[in-house]
């Protein structure tokens, strides 16, 4: 009688442990696959570089920036709608693997991530390769930054997407900031305030972009 109770108790314990392990395995598969730090399914595509997952998490693609779409009464930028449409085609409703940038969130609280489809397609890179995004440096992981920079250089050479647009008010030179990886027009107050040891001069807008610097938001070089 005593041993029957012991055996029944152990059977119950084993069953409970088994169920716990099953739940743990399922939970783990929803957050980490193939080395990704998170996993999620896309509910909504906001624009070319931002998505919302089914759990409500907002994700900003690390190291890239796409043109703005019309919002809050503001007009959209050239290729903004095309970038969003391309992003939708890539990710809408799909499961994604996310690898977080060194700085995991931006000042809006969005996750900063390198995003991959289940077949390994690098979403950030696809947008850059097609000329729908330019580089903007976060706390970048070197391996992805170098890949994205090479893709941008190729898109620049081929004048794809945003790189097919004429340069607005070209300058004789541009001022870059080696600390922020941003470049400005020569008369821009933000460029002029750059410390001498951080300042770099580019002969053209193309040269600044080729080196991975992003255009300043105020003077829009």
Residue ranges and their predicted role:
Residues 2-221:
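Small beta-barrel nucleic-acid-binding modules, primarily SNase/OB-fold domains
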